């Protein structure tokens, strides 16, 4: 329990009618440390208790008895709490040394499923930086929910259906070279895709031809189906090579095509519930009562179903298959209106579980301030970017530690971790400008900075030949170690806050803060001096390294023991 919750629970014992959340919101940090570590103003209780705030403060101070406080005193209308830093430090360190990497594990989810729709790149297009965000945010959220007792189900809803396959088939039949595509599938398919889109801008017949090929694909035409399957298989091989490098796995690759035979049921359900309305020859669901101006377009006048129909089928399938407690869609900000419609249609269908569905939007990645677009060929491809990040990490490691064992393995952990961390430290709904040099830097608020702090601590522990024991009586009460203790104590609450807000950046910022606090401590403390407090200082080092490593793991980032 962190110090604020400790104080709130002690106050609540004295004033049981006051909600703990209210007490927490009222706690203040005094400007002057001589007035305690935290203070509670008693003004809000004056009306209910019909006493002066000064008397209430005095009553509360007298009744609180806990060995976690050096003293509790009333000063005017305030109750000032002076924490027993040595006692709390000892308690926190013993807990981390006992639990190890399981520290801060919780069972809030009780094993229930969380379906996470994430990554979802388009088949036959390269895996770009644009897909990085959905991949790493989704992967981190899976780790975070797992840590608090849920069972994450990671779903890669592949973009493996749609008119773009008509375009691709037209392009391949016009200019395609089977040998070239087999040798470099994604590169060649991208060239074809960009070329056919450029031609379509000046020649309207290209669009019509693409629509015709897509109609054939929908009708299971053998030639169209064979080409589609080939494009899909080749793309997936390439994607999986990248996922392996990024250390990301999935529980399902059911993409858009998987739901082709499941949309008829959606239409039947909507009809049976009298929700479909005709509008200009199309079938729609009106959603005005949900404050949504535009109706959900379910079926076009030519009989073609739409993206939302497929997502309705997917939502029904996932509910039946996974019986989820939460269903999360990690998809860009630009899809917000679509997901509002999706939830509203399910609500209209009387599916209360639609309340458990959440769109987790994120901002754009730009380059030099410009938006990226595969169609226009203005794109940062992930594979060469990861390779470049690993090379830059390798150069820095060579300069810092030329005799390091497993240099290639460490460079991969640092390079890949740098890209992931930079993405995840950004508030999810904000975008960021892609800057590889800033990402891989060992200075500043970066992944390598946090990894290096962890490796530095491991070096100290090796020198000291430290073996963790939770039976020793650890005691620290200096200012800098206390800052670290407070953060470590707060870690369980930080994880829950990250889960509640679907916000991995909360963990990333916590890790940066902890690394900075440790580096400050390291600069001012002779950790290995043989004196009465050496075992306490080493226990603090061990606890810090444990929490740093676990923070990074929750972000999908490795923490090498040497760098």
Swiss-Prot record:
Where is it located?
Cytoplasm
Q: What is its EC number?
A: 6.1.1.19
> What molecular functions are annotated in GO for this chain?
arginine-tRNA ligase activity; ATP binding
Q: What is its main location?
A: cytoplasm
Motif 'HIGH' region residues? 121-131
| Catalyzed reaction equations | tRNA(Arg) + L-arginine + ATP = L-arginyl-tRNA(Arg) + AMP + diphosphate
Listed under GO biological process in this entry are: arginyl-tRNA aminoacylation
Sections of the chain in a coiled coil: none
Q: Name one GO cellular component term.
A: cytoplasm
Q: Does the keyword Nucleotidyltransferase apply?
A: no
Keywords tagged on the record: Aminoacyl-tRNA synthetase, ATP-binding, Cytoplasm, Ligase, Nucleotide-binding, Protein biosynthesis
What quaternary structure, including any partners, is listed in this protein's UniProt entry? Monomer.
What's this protein's family per the entry? Answer: Belongs to the class-I aminoacyl-tRNA synthetase family.
Name the chain's protein: Arginine--tRNA ligase
Q: Which organism is this protein's natural source?
A: Streptococcus agalactiae serotype Ia (strain ATCC 27591 / A909 / CDC SS700)
At the highest ranks, the source species' classification is: Bacteria, Bacillati, Bacillota, Bacilli, Lactobacillales
Please state the gene responsible for encoding this protein: argS
């Amino acid at each position: 329990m962190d110090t604020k919750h400790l104080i709130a629970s002690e106050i609540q014992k004295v004033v049981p009618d006051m909600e703990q959340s209210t007490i927490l919101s009222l706690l203040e940090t005094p400007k002057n440390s001589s007035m305690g570590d935290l203070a509670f103003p008693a003004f809000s209780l004056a009306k209910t208790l019909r006493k002066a705030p000064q008397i209430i403060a005095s009553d509360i101070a007298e009744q609180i008895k806990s060995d976690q406080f050096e003293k509790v005193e009333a000063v005017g209308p305030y109750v000032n709490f002076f924490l027993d830093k040595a006692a709390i430090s000892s308690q926190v360190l013993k807990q981390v040394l006992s639990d190890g990497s399981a520290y801060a594990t919780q069972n809030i989810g009780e094993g229930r499923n969380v379906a996470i729709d994430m990554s979802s790149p388009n088949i036959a297009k390269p895996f770009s930086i644009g897909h990085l965000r959905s991949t790493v945010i989704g992967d981190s959220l899976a780790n975070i929910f797992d840590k608090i007792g849920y069972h994450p189900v990671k779903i890669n809803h592949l973009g493996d259906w749609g008119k773009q396959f008509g375009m691709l088939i037209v392009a391949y039949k016009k200019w395609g070279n089977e040998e070239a595509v087999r040798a470099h599938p994604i590169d060649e398919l991208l060239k074809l895709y960009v070329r056919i889109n450029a031609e379509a801008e000046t020649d309207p017949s290209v669009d019509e031809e693409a629509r015709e090929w897509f109609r054939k694909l929908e009708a299971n035409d053998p030639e169209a189906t064979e080409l589609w399957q080939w494009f899909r298989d080749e793309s997936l091989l390439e994607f999986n090579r990248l996922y392996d490098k990024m250390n990301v796995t999935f529980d399902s690759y059911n993409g858009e095509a998987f739901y082709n035979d499941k949309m008829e049921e959606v239409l039947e359900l909507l009809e049976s519930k009298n929700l479909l309305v005709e509008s200009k020859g199309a079938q729609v669901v009106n959603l005005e009562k949900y404050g949504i101006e535009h109706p959900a377009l379910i079926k076009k006048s030519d009989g073609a179903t739409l993206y939302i129909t497929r997502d309705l089928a997917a939502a029904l399938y996932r509910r039946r298959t996974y019986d989820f407690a939460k269903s999360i869609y990690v998809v860009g900000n630009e899809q917000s209106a679509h997901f509002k419609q999706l939830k509203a249609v399910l609500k209209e269908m009387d599916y209360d579980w639609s309340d458990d569905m959440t769109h987790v939007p994120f901002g754009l990645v730009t380059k030099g301030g410009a938006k990226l677009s595969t169609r226009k060929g203005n794109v940062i491809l992930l594979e060469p970017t990861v390779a470049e990040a690993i090379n830059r990490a390798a150069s820095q490691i060579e300069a810092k530690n030329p005799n390091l064992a497993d240099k290639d393995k460490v460079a991969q952990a640092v390079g890949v971790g740098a890209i992931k961390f930079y993405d995840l430290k950004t508030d999810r709904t904000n975008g960021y400008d892609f800057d590889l040099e800033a990402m891989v830097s060992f200075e500043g608020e970066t992944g390598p900075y946090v990894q290096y702090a962890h490796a530095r601590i491991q070096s100290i522990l090796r020198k000291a030949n430290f073996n963790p024991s939770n039976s020793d009586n650890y005691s620290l009460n200096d200012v800098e170690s206390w800052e670290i203790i407070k953060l470590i104590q707060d870690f369980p609450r930080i994880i829950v806050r990250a889960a509640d807000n679907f916000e991995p950046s909360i963990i990333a910022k916590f890790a940066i803060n902890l690394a900075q606090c440790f580096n400050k401590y390291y600069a001012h403390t002779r950790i290995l001096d043989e004196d009465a407090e050496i075992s306490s200082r080493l226990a603090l080092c061990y606890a810090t390294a444990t929490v740093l490593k676990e923070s990074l793991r929750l972000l999908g980032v490795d923490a090498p023991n040497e760098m």
